[in-house]
Amino acid sequence: MNNVLLHRITEKGNIRYYSIEIIATLFEEYMVERVYGNVRFKSCTGIKNNVFPSFNEAQIFFEKLKKQKMKKGYA
């Protein structure tokens, strides 16, 4: 489906990542999954999921998140 991997380097030199993906579920819904963290750690800092009844709604949310993260310095 749709996915994007964003990253940024903080002032302290930490590399942060933020992955956003749209996934079709078995129930004809769409889930936007966000995985984020610091590359220095073995596992991610967090995972968040949002479920939408249509692809269009999921796409709008996906683009909104992407725009917000890019404003915060992720590329």
Could you describe each region identified by the protein language model?
Residues 13-14, 28:
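Short acidic/glycine-enriched loop/turn segments that link adjacent beta-strands
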Residues 72-75:
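Boundary/linker segments flanking structured domains
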Residues 7, 19-20:
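N-terminal first-folded block
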Residues 1, 9, 27, 59-62:
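Helix-centric, low-specificity signal for extended rod-like, repetitive segments
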Residues 1-13, 43, 53:
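Negatively charged, low-complexity tracts enriched in Asp/Glu with abundant Ser/Thr
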Residues 20-48, 63:
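Short aromatic-glycine-(Arg/Gly/Cys) micro-motifs in beta-strand/loop hairpins
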Residues 41-44, 53-70:
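A short, charged, amphipathic alpha-helix used as a generic interaction element across diverse proteins
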